[in-house]
């Protein structure tokens, strides 16, 4: 809503220039030089230049900032990992540079055919250096301090209640933006959301429960599309018995995902997931098809194999297996799913699993939290990828204590990740991704359960509303019929 990248996705989902006018790539595929559009401005009217992009990208890779999205950059940018993780390279020495006000250049550690898609993701969006330095940690906390460069800007903010955005007159494409105001209202109860939409109080509802699905399925008001994210569970691979891949795979194969999605969650629109790459990503060889559909499942539910693996690991019929737990944040939905998983493991494998809700602040805390400190056996996680390419999924598991907190150490996987960042393309890249999923299906540091779906109820008077692959709403191309 408020930010725009070098590139963006248009109304048809095509990658097109936004802040950038054009780009060039060096012969070795490692240096990208972007030419920015002339006359770009921040929402306060101040100039937006290549220096803002240099500052912003370096800020994400600055270990003192501690950005959670840094892995997206350090996975491809030369010396990024050494800067953010190893701290052996100064952020000032990174090969991210403004050559002049409209020319921005970056060097990659290796050719990456998907790099341009990264420049349309959240981690790569610019922030105003002047604004961040003036207001510090509060730079984005109020309309008075927040300067942006997207189609809309923040006009009013009532925390946990509502946000009001108004058209940004300084947006480079402002003449094409037809809506003057977007009001975001936070309604906690799904039934309240449905009632508000039913009564015409909402033009768009992005929280759609099972009752709303039943009421609007088959109508033009229900909008649904794949979202490149999923619900999954992490194993703590540093703790016995979950340091044994056979145990992790056994628990993964013993889950009936259809019961979870259609029975427990009562949502038949949620695709069950049998691989680490979610639906909603175009195939490498044939981009008219979904990668997941072309490649097929990386594993299948198989209780007999699960029993055999558990016996091979020294726990025949679950004998001698310690009581363990699933941890999650307080939620009736998450509790019901955890109870169902525990019941399946008890029924099929003879295992005793406790379910434990942990207060959200404790669960998600950066250093001392449940996941960050490793205080779990199995932990709930939900995640939406930063960009629509399989590499975005594989990068999540590259660092044992990065975005995923699995504490999984696998040199063979790291070797494949390094190969992933080479200049291979086409069928060779597709085969590499298959190999990476096959390895994950054997090692199982994580258990994918189901794919997210971006559903919304959209009033008949709204035209042109879209959501990108991340599920983020896009109002740039919307019109409202009076």
Which stretches of residues belong to each language-model region?
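Surface-exposed binding/hinge segments that line
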Residues: 35, 54, 68-130
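Alpha-helical secondary-structure segments
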Residues: 49-56, 101-107, 150-151, 179-181, ...
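Ligand-site clamp/hinge motif
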Residues: 169-215
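Ligand/substrate-recognition segments at binding pockets and active sites
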Residues: 159, 303, 307, 311-385, ...
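Structural transition elements
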Residues: 271-312, 331-335
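Gly/Pro-rich hinge or "lid" segments in bacterial periplasmic/extracellular proteins
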Residues: 11, 101-102, 107-177, 181, ...
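Detector for C-terminal structural segments
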Residues: 254-286, 333-343, 368-482
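N-terminal lobe/hinge region of extracytoplasmic solute-binding protein
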Residues: 1-27, 147-148
């Amino acid at each position: 809503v408020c930010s725009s990248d070098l590139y963006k996705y248009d109304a048809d989902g095509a990658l097109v220039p936004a802040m950038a006018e054009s780009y060039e790539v060096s012969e070795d595929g490692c240096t990208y030089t972007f030419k920015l559009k002339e006359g770009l401005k921040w929402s306060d009217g101040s100039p937006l230049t290549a220096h803002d992009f240099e500052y912003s990208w370096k800020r994400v890779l600055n270990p003192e900032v501690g950005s959670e999205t840094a892995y997206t950059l350090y996975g491809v940018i030369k010396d990024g990992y050494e800067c953010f993780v190893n701290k052996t390279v100064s952020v000032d020495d990174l090969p991210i540079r403004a050559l002049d006000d409209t020319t921005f250049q970056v060097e990659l550690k290796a050719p990456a055919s998907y790099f341009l898609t990264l420049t349309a993701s959240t981690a790569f969006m610019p922030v105003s250096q002047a604004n961040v330095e003036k207001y510090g940690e509060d730079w984005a906390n109020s309309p008075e301090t927040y300067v942006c460069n997207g189609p809309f800007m923040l006009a009013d903010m009532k925390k946990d209640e509502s946000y009001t955005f108004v058209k940004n007159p300084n947006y480079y494409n402002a003449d094409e933006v037809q809506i003057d105001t977007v009001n975001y209202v936070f309604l906690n109860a799904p039934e309240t959301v449905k009632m508000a939409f039913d009564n015409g109080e909402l033009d768009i509802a992005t929280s759609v429960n099972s009752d709303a699905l039943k009421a609007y399925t088959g109508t033009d008001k229900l909008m649904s599309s794949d979202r490149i994210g999923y619900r999954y569970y992490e194993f703590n691979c540093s703790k016995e018995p979950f340091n044994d891949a056979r145990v992790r795979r056994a628990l993964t194969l013993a889950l009936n995902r259809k019961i979870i999605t259609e029975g427990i969650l009562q949502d038949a629109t949620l695709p069950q997931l049998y691989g680490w790459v979610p639906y909603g990503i175009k195939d490498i060889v044939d981009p008219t098809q979904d990668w997941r559909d072309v490649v097929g499942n990386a594993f299948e539910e198989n209780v007999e194999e699960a029993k055999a693996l558990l016996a091979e690991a020294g726990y025949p019929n679950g004998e001698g297996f310690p009581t363990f737990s699933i941890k999650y944040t307080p939620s009736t939905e998450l509790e019901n799913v955890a109870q169902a998983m525990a019941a399946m493991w008890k029924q099929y494998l003879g295992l005793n699993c406790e379910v434990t809700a942990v207060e959200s602040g404790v669960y998600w805390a950066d250093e001392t939290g449940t996941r960050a400190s490793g205080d779990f056996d199995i932990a709930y996680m939900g995640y939406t990828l930063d960009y629509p390419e399989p590499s975005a999924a594989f990068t999540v598991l590259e660092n044992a204590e990065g975005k995923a907190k699995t504490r999984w150490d696998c040199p063979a996987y790291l070797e494949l990740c390094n190969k992933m960042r080479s200049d291979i393309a086409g069928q060779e890249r597709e085969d590499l991704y298959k190999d990476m999923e096959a390895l994950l299906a054997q090692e199982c540091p994580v258990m994918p359960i189901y794919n997210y779906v971006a559903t919304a109820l959209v009033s008949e008077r709204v035209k042109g509303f879209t959501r990108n692959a991340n599920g983020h709403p896009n109002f740039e191309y919307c019109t409202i019929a009076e």
